[in-house]
Amino acid sequence: MESMTMIILQSLIIFITILFFKKQKRGKKSNTPRSPPRLPLIGNLHQLGHHPHRSLCSLSHRYGPLMLLHLGRVPVLVVSSADVARDILKTHDRVFASRPRSKLFEKLFYDGRDVAFAPYGEYWRQIKSVCVLRLLSNKMVTSFRNVRQEEISLMMEKIQKSSSLQVNVSELLGSLTNDVISRIALGRKYSGETDSKELMKRLMMLMGEFSVGTYVPWLGWIDWISGLDGQLNKTGNDLDEFLEKVVQDHVDGDGQRTDFVDVLLRIQREKSIGFEIDRLCIKAIVLDVLVAGTDSSYALMDWAMTELLRHPECLRTLQEEVRTICKGNLSVSEEDIQNMSYLKAVIKETTRLHPPLPLLAPHESIQDVILGDYHIPAGTQVMINAWAIGREAATWGPDAEKFRPERHLDSSVDFRGHNFELVPFGAGRRICPAISFAVVLIEVALANFVHRYDWKLPEDSKENQTNVAESTGMVIHRLFPLYAIASSTT
């Protein structure tokens, strides 16, 4: 009896597999982009690997700059060229302006009440307007200049105390961005509080986790077995408790500060925008700022220093520019950096090779659309592979894999959403609204880093320190911390 049951089961599996591949073969005749072969149930999930941006780039060389994957039951377009990115983010920007639902972001970001992951619609338009006009305007960016300068001065003092010894560059830059963003968004630093630091680490780690249930709903129990559901619930609750305390402290305060929480509470009290924001909305917006402002800026500065130490001639050129413009001054001001063209080229080149989110936050189509020669149904997800676009030889030339800031000196290409060959912050309606906010910190911090100190790699670990191995996760960092030796020039 048991042997007969096994024969029936095996026959059934073979029959289902044959039907699946016949259906897939027929599907190839439909007017959709090319797809890699997929497996039953999981589709192309097995082809993502530990570094999906690299795996998808390799697949695009075979299946084209616009290819269709099936991640479980979810159809996903993968974009790997500037031309296709332009079609998605400009020509059909409104159609692809929404975000897909995700268990991770629902649990951690107040069920899409934030700016980054809210679905496209009136609510998203209103809160984006609040962020752009009231929190991230040029006036607000300038108003926090003293905060940036104070924290950079403290960082310089830490380096001075470690002069001629190995400096953990990664740790320094991480602390700097965390302290600056905390003061601007929350009104004070939290870097000395172990619980809040561990909470943010847990959040960053979970954002890079894979939820099986999001793509294969009937296998959602795997998220429970693996502990992901429990981690999401605990971290989401802990985040809410932390942010609730922060907001309540501001409510109980004098209201005279100008950090982001106070600005949002003032908007709530005055009802001055024709749109009511509630407590959850305030916490969601603040969480966006903490996550995006801290992790992305830190990653970019860390990669910039890595590339400069890997290419000493570029480091010398940058130091010569900074020291010439700031001759006689101990520090670099934000006015000084306006004239530093090579500094800006270094940062552009870093974003090209090391976009902090190599796969931009996913988009989703809100209606059927014709994209080139293809019919794309409503509800199709889109992954923009910024990492692949930044290394596209057709755009950047045969040395596209090489760090060469000079390529930007006579180029008008920028990362502010008008040039689709460089999209580390996205483009179109969903472009990161905090570009200016992030870039000014990166520029002035990096300029001060190289102005007062000469940097070199430890002789006993040069190979390890110049390694560009990547971490896993949504934001890509160095796999190992960067150490270097600083020697003062004064």
Swiss-Prot record:
Entry annotated with the keyword Mitochondrion: no
Protein's cellular compartments: Membrane
Binding site for heme: 432
CDD domains: CYP71-like (cd11072)
Keywords from the UniProt entry: Heme, Iron, Membrane, Metal-binding, Monooxygenase, Oxidoreductase, Transmembrane, Transmembrane helix
PROSITE patterns xrefs: CYTOCHROME_P450
Main localization category: membrane
InterPro entries in the record: Cyt_P450 (IPR001128), Cyt_P450_CS (IPR017972), Cyt_P450_E_grp-I (IPR002401), Cyt_P450_sf (IPR036396)
Molecular function terms from GO: heme binding; iron ion binding; monooxygenase activity; oxidoreductase activity, acting on paired donors, with incorporation or reduction of molecular oxygen
Gene3D superfamilies: Cytochrome P450
TM ranges: 1-21
Cofactor: heme
A Pfam family annotated for this UniProt entry: p450
Metal-binding found in the keyword field: yes
SUPFAM superfamilies referenced in this protein's UniProt entry, alphabetically: Cytochrome P450
Membrane topology: Single-pass membrane protein
GO cellular component: a single term: membrane
EC code: 1.14.-.-
Family in the record: Belongs to the cytochrome P450 family.
This protein's name: Cytochrome P450 71A21
Phylogenetic lineage: Eukaryota, Viridiplantae, Streptophyta, Embryophyta, Tracheophyta
